[in-house]
Regions:
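Juxtamembrane intracellular "pre-TM" segments in multi-pass secondary transporters
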Residues: 176-203
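C-terminal membrane-cytosol helix-exit motif in multi-pass small-molecule transporters
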Residues: 162-183, 366-373
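Hydrophobic core of transmembrane alpha-helices in multi-pass small-molecule transporters
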Residues: 10, 87-101, 289-303
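C-terminal ends and interior cores of transmembrane alpha-helices
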Residues: 70-83, 270-284
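Residue-level signature of mid-helix packing/kink "hotspots" within the transmembrane helices
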Residues: 42-50, 134-135, 241-249, 336-337
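Helix-loop boundary and gating motifs at the non-cytosolic
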Residues: 1-42, 200, 208-226
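Cytoplasmic helix-loop-helix junction between adjacent transmembrane helices
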Residues: 93-129, 310-311
Length: 376
């Protein structure tokens, strides 16, 4: 059950990552038009997430998840049949709704299938599948662009739709619903008030997604800088990625033992240190001298996302878990959009300013979150 959810999230994010690469080449339009069309996806995901979360608390979560996967499959395939900007805009906006459906139900089902004693570790796996799928999706998109020339690019969307279809068929076959909808309507199921409990983690959570959005500008910033991608640099970046993947599992498990928010704050301070040191060392191109400081700090940074997701699942309970997990899509969409905008501006000042801006956003958010946690 949990393994399927990892695979489903991984495959779905591969699809979305590849579409991000395909879209600018598929649409014959000015850059700003393509940007607007791309923005429709996170906007519709953010707007639709809360209604979908509430629906997940009142309707079969498995069926809703399958509906989301079917929608993604149909919409992705449909884009391959048209290059009309209006049609593609509508289809891409609807894809945001289907993405919210798949993401919210996946998190809700994962929360249902886990307990306080293992939820952090499981959410670490979810975060790893999510980010790993996106990263691999960018590579898959690049491969599809090379395999299919311009006139055959529709086939790339149909191949991507096939990935979504496979994930949907797996859901219908293997997905088990830990909590039935009739159980949620029983009088003994307590309706928890989660507003005051969820508020303290929001500042760090939003800051984290904004920083992630700014990271989307790093490939261009690296290309514009004088930093050479030597063998040593690639090894350094590879170790960073491996440590982040390992840390998501390790710190998720640690949070099962000593508490979510404590691990989250420690991870946020680790990320702050990484942003400052890496940004400071980039202009002189001597960041490899500090690799034994940068690696452990980036390792700590991997603690933030899984502990927040586990914390939300902990405090929401069965009855409101769908509504609470809707915040995932809302915060992620808003944060990525803001991060893309800020990153676009600061990247022109130099690659180091992406990291300085991230630190400038993260530090006050840590202070606010820590203050709110102490006042609870």
């Amino acid at each position: 059950m949990v393994l399927y959810l990892y695979v489903a999230v991984f495959l779905t994010r591969i699809g979305f990552g590849s579409i991000t690469i395909l879209f600018p080449l598929y649409l014959q339009a000015p850059g700003y038009i393509i940007g607007v069309i791309l923005a429709l996806y996170p906007m519709s995901e953010a707007v639709s997430a809360l209604p979908i979360g509430r629906l997940a608390d009142r309707f079969s979560r498995k069926r809703l998840h399958i509906i989301g996967m079917i929608m993604i499959t149909i919409l992705t395939a449909a884009i391959g049949f048209t290059r009309n900007l209006l049609n593609v805009s509508i289809l891409h906006a609807l894809m945001g709704i289907s993405a919210a459906t798949a993401a919210v139900t996946s998190l809700t089902l994962l929360g249902d299938a886990t307990k306080l004693t293992n939820r952090g570790k499981s959410m670490g796996g979810f975060d790893l599948a999510n980010l790993g799928g996106y990263g691999l999706g960018f590579g898959v998109g690049g491969i599809l662009v090379n395999v299919f020339p311009d006139k055959l690019l529709p086939y790339a969307f149909w191949v991507t739709a096939g990935v979504f279809l496979f994930a949907g068929l797996m859901a219908a076959k293997f997905l088990v619903e830990p909590v039935r909808v009739w159980e949620l309507k029983q009088p003994k199921i307590r309706q928890r008030r989660i507003g005051t409990k969820i508020r303290p983690v929001i500042p760090v959570w939003i800051a984290q997604t904004i920083i992630l959005g700014m990271y989307f500008l790093l490939p261009k910033a690296f290309r514009d800088s004088n930093i050479a991608l030597t063998r040593e640099t690639l090894i350094f970046l590879g170790v960073l990625g491996g440590l982040f993947a390992l840390g998501a599992i390790v710190f998720g498990h640690v949070s099962d033992k000593i508490g979510r928010t404590r691990v989250m704050v420690i991870g946020a301070f680790g990320e702050l240190g990484f942003l400052l040191l890496f940004g400071w060392s980039l202009p002189r191109n001597d960041f490899l001298k500090y690799e034994f400081f940068l690696w452990p700090m980036f390792f700590l940074a991997s603690a933030v996302a899984p502990t927040i997701l586990a914390y939300i699942a902990d405090i929401s309970g069965k009855a409101k878990r769908g509504s609470a997990n809707a915040l995932y899509s809302i915060v992620l969409s808003i944060g990525l959009a803001i991060g893309n905008i800020i990153g676009g501006f600061v990247a022109d000042l130099g690659i180091q300013w992406i990291f300085y801006a991230g630190a400038g956003i993260l530090f006050p958010s840590i202070l606010v979150t820590s203050t709110l946690l102490r006042r609870r």
